[in-house]
């Protein structure tokens, strides 16, 4: 046995330290955005107008996405002027290059309860709304029809099975949305599509920014979870539909 072979064998005898491994994994985990920094920038920049401005940005994200320049040329003159003014005011960008980049979608993801409630109210304006989802399953929860719902899936206060069911139910919309906005994905396999949104989804679900107790309370209020914390029938059906894709 060579010296290097011996070292490899001895390395394999190192005891696994679960705490150390989990610390490494957390340090290396996908981190797409920092909601606290985004909200701080919005509030400090916007002053008294930050809430109204932010709601406008979120509705834009829900209905048009991140393509500010392209979308501004295909809307009312007043809407275009307001959008471009907000882009300059808050430094909005169309593509997130760093954790500090502020895109319309990131603004929406940073404020998930308001965003998801707005999605349910604006459902007919969504790029992938009830007209699409109700062809897949009946009564698909409208709050799930947006990019912010992952931040509301709890990892505490409910069973692991409940977390898994909600992630699968939400993935049904994510699959449809990905294929809608990305032409290259329309012929892709379920696994390929899932891999395209897997990391951001898991990052949102596992984020500690939005408290789990607030997530559970909100989901119960919307009927997505029952009083006992069990997923609604609609969520269960949606999860099954995703598994069967």
From Swiss-Prot:
<feature type="binding site">
    <location>
        <position position="106"/>
    </location>
    <ligand>
        <name>RNA</name>
    </ligand>
</feature>
<dbReference type="Pfam" id="PF05733">
    <property type="entry name" value="Tenui_N"/>
</dbReference>
<feature type="site" description="RNA-binding">
    <location>
        <position position="106"/>
    </location>
</feature>
<dbReference type="GO" id="GO:0042025">
    <property type="term" value="C:host cell nucleus"/>
</dbReference>
<feature type="site" description="RNA-binding">
    <location>
        <position position="184"/>
    </location>
</feature>
<keyword id="KW-0543">Viral nucleoprotein</keyword>
<dbReference type="GO" id="GO:0044177">
    <property type="term" value="C:host cell Golgi apparatus"/>
</dbReference>
<protein>
    <recommendedName>
        <fullName>Nucleoprotein</fullName>
    </recommendedName>
</protein>
<dbReference type="GO" id="GO:0044172">
    <property type="term" value="C:host cell endoplasmic reticulum-Golgi intermediate compartment"/>
</dbReference>
<dbReference type="GO" id="GO:0019013">
    <property type="term" value="C:viral nucleocapsid"/>
</dbReference>
<keyword id="KW-0694">RNA-binding</keyword>
<keyword id="KW-1035">Host cytoplasm</keyword>
<comment type="function">
    <text>Encapsidates the genomic RNA, protecting it from nucleases. Displays high affinity for single-stranded nucleic acid. The encapsidated genomic RNA is termed the nucleocapsid (NC) or ribonucleoprotein. The ribonucleoprotein has a non-helical structure. Serves as template for viral transcription and replication. After replication, the nucleocapsid is recruited to the host Golgi apparatus by glycoprotein Gn for packaging into virus particles.</text>
</comment>
<feature type="site" description="RNA-binding">
    <location>
        <position position="95"/>
    </location>
</feature>
<keyword id="KW-0167">Capsid protein</keyword>
<keyword id="KW-1048">Host nucleus</keyword>
<keyword id="KW-0687">Ribonucleoprotein</keyword>
<dbReference type="InterPro" id="IPR015971">
    <property type="entry name" value="Nucleocapsid_Phlebovirus"/>
</dbReference>
<feature type="binding site">
    <location>
        <position position="186"/>
    </location>
    <ligand>
        <name>RNA</name>
    </ligand>
</feature>
<feature type="binding site">
    <location>
        <position position="196"/>
    </location>
    <ligand>
        <name>RNA</name>
    </ligand>
</feature>
<dbReference type="InterPro" id="IPR009522">
    <property type="entry name" value="Capsid_Phlebovir/Tenuivir"/>
</dbReference>
<feature type="site" description="RNA-binding">
    <location>
        <position position="70"/>
    </location>
</feature>
<comment type="similarity">
    <text>Belongs to the phlebovirus nucleocapsid protein family.</text>
</comment>
<dbReference type="GO" id="GO:1990904">
    <property type="term" value="C:ribonucleoprotein complex"/>
</dbReference>
<feature type="site" description="RNA-binding">
    <location>
        <position position="64"/>
    </location>
</feature>
<feature type="binding site">
    <location>
        <position position="67"/>
    </location>
    <ligand>
        <name>RNA</name>
    </ligand>
</feature>
<dbReference type="GO" id="GO:0003723">
    <property type="term" value="F:RNA binding"/>
</dbReference>
<feature type="binding site">
    <location>
        <position position="30"/>
    </location>
    <ligand>
        <name>RNA</name>
    </ligand>
</feature>
<comment type="subunit">
    <text>Homodimer. Homohexamer; ring-shaped, necessary to form the nucleocapsid. Homopentamers; opened pentamers in solution. Binds to viral genomic RNA. Interacts with glycoprotein Gn; this interaction allows packaging of nucleocapsids into virions.</text>
</comment>
<keyword id="KW-0946">Virion</keyword>
<feature type="site" description="RNA-binding">
    <location>
        <position position="67"/>
    </location>
</feature>
<keyword id="KW-1040">Host Golgi apparatus</keyword>
């Amino acid at each position: 046995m060579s010296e290097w072979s011996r070292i490899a064998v001895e390395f394999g005898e190192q005891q696994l330290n679960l705490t150390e491994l989990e610390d490494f994994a957390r340090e290396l985990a996908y981190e797409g955005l920092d909601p606290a920094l985004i909200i701080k920038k919005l509030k400090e920049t916007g002053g008294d107008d930050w809430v109204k401005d932010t709601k406008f940005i979120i509705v834009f994200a829900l209905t048009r996405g991140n393509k500010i320049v392209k979308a501004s040329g295909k809307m009312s003159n007043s809407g275009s002027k307001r959008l471009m003014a907000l882009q300059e005011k808050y430094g909005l960008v169309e593509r997130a290059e760093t954790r500090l980049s502020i895109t319309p979608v990131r603004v929406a993801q940073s404020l998930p309860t308001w965003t998801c409630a707005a999605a349910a109210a604006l459902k007919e304006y969504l790029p992938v709304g009830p007209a699409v989802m109700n062809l897949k399953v009946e009564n698909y929860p409208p709050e799930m029809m947006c990019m912010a719902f992952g931040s509301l899936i709890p990892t505490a206060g409910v069973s692991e099975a409940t977390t898994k069911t909600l992630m699968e139910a939400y993935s049904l919309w994510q699959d449809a949305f990905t294929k809608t906005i990305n032409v290259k994905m329309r012929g892709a396999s379920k696994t390929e599509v899932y891999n395209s949104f897997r990391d951001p989804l898991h990052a949102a679900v596992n984020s500690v920014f939005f408290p789990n107790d607030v997530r559970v309370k909100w989901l119960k209020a919307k009927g997505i979870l029952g009083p006992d914390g069990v997923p609604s029938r609609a969520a269960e059906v949606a999860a099954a539909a995703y598994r069967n894709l």
